Amino acid sequence: MAPQQQPSSIPTPYEDLLREILETGTPKGDRTGTGTTSLFGRQIRYDLSAGFPLITTKSVHVKSVVGELLWFLRGDSNVRWLQENGIRIWNEWADENGDLGPVYGVQWRSWPTPNGQHIDQIAGALETLQTNPDSRRNIVSAWNVSELDNMALPPCHLLFQLYVANGKLSCQLYQRSADMFLGVPFNIASYSLLTHMFAQQAGLEVGEFIWTGGDCHIYDNHVEQVKLQLSRDARPYPQLKLNKAADMFSYDFSDIEFTGYDPHPVIKAKVAV
């Protein structure tokens, strides 16, 4: 059984979902051969105006979160830039030259069209926020079916939609495959940061970040780590200080600072490849 939830005024939707998976999930096999406990179709929400959702029940490597997002926004698909900045989270999937194929950043910035052109989805999304904020078509997708076989790993977090109401920007992410212990805290933080960037560039306030998961799973070799995490009380979320860059593609590490981040110690676990 999972540890009992400790009373707290701090919203903990991520930890609540971890607990639900442990208590009610279904044992399933998986591609990696590790084994999981899984639930299908869950959603968690964060009010971005109330604090930045950087998980506090364990320490999240902030530089990797920021660096990976900047790398996506560069349209890059080689791990060299990540490695030069001390980030190794993609090493296991790269080939001998550091290439990953046409993964996230390539699809975001350079989606190929049948006539040989390319679409910059990020630039298009920002333009839509600025010119037609009520659009229901403001979607960015990394799930390019024609190129999946050329990717080192098909996109797990594959599609996000932007929504404006009352001058506030919200973002909903759909994640088909959710490694709840290792991956999802990164994804929540990454797309929350991206939402702040879009809002800043479009002259909007931030609203909600909504995470929607398909196969939400805890790997069998992460169960003890999850139980340890759930035994900890959540601490207040940090605040984000974001210097405004010239455009969406000019943000740098120095523009992004989290203040008041005081997490519990890191909990190590092996990534399933």
Swiss-Prot record:
Keyword set, alphabetical order: Cytoplasm, Methyltransferase, Nucleotide biosynthesis, Transferase
Single GO biological process annotation from the record: methylation
Binding-site residues, dUMP: R31, R136, R137, R176, S177, A178, D179, N187, H217, I218, Y219
Active site: C156 (nucleophile)
GO terms, molecular function: thymidylate synthase activity
Family: Belongs to the thymidylate synthase family. Bacterial-type ThyA subfamily.
Function according to Swiss-Prot or TrEMBL: Catalyzes the reductive methylation of 2'-deoxyuridine-5'-monophosphate (dUMP) to 2'-deoxythymidine-5'-monophosphate (dTMP) while utilizing 5,10-methylenetetrahydrofolate (mTHF) as the methyl donor and reductant in the reaction, yielding dihydrofolate (DHF) as a by-product. This enzymatic reaction provides an intracellular de novo source of dTMP, an essential precursor for DNA biosynthesis.
Name this protein carries in UniProt: Thymidylate synthase
Species, as recorded: Corynebacterium jeikeium (strain K411)
Lineage of origin: Bacteria, Bacillati, Actinomycetota, Actinomycetes, Mycobacteriales
